[in-house]
């Protein structure tokens, strides 16, 4: 399995608009996990594989940078 497939990475600089999961939660492939707000638009980030959410440290309203890892799925 490719390591990049495990990570949910911010595609753009912005802020966390919504977090739909928590650490330890099991998610399905293509399930929405986080929404980022940037340039007055919301961007939906989805799980690239099924598994358990780990490493979620952000909360709603946090500023994030493009390329930042938001969470991983194991």
Show the residue positions of the predicted features.
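Short beta-strand-turn/beta-hairpin segments enriched in glycine/proline and small hydrophobics
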Residues: 1-15, 32-48
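A structural signal for short beta-strand/turn segments enriched in small hydrophobics and glycine
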Residues: 24-33, 61-70
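Short C-terminal tail/terminal secondary-structure segment
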Residues: 73-74
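Short histidine-centered loop motifs in beta-beta connectors
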Residues: 11-12, 17-22, 26, 55-58
